[in-house]
Amino acid sequence: MRTNFSSPRGPLVRRDPRGLPRNHPLPAWTSHSFHTHAVDLSVDPVTGEVSINRYVVAQDVGFAINPTYIEGQIEGGVAQGIGQALSEEIVYDGGRVLNANLTDYKMPTMLDMPRVECILIEKPSVNGPYGAKGVGEPPCIQPPAAIANAIAVATGVRVQTLPITAEKIALARLEDSD
């Protein structure tokens, strides 16, 4: 993909040999995200209700410019991931949304959140400003997989669709016992 940065009078943006704007304080950059999530949870054997007892995230953050802010980003990402894993669902029928409003879209609240233990691993990036890496998006990715695997270990059954609700767990246990 190419972008044109010119006008009839010449280039609008002067570029260095790598194609980056010259003297730009923060040119676009990428760095790989390395992180792991561990979750300790329990599943009620009768209702299938999931309770998260402990949630731990270890994430390579490059250089931690503001560790408290980074922990907040990780906690927010984990909250999004827990919602994806356990409660958030948009129901469709033939392309039509059946959720009447957002009260039917169950996002986790602070009362639903476990304490998230953050382990910040600092391995500065050569690409990021001051060696920092992006920290906001990566924590959203792992929670559904970590929670699904922990539920499978706790119950002996694997639910294949998100969100993993108490009803889906109970049905999977019934099917497994047949």
What spans do the regions from the language model cover?
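C-terminal catalytic domains of large/alpha subunits in multi-subunit enzymes
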Residues: 1-178
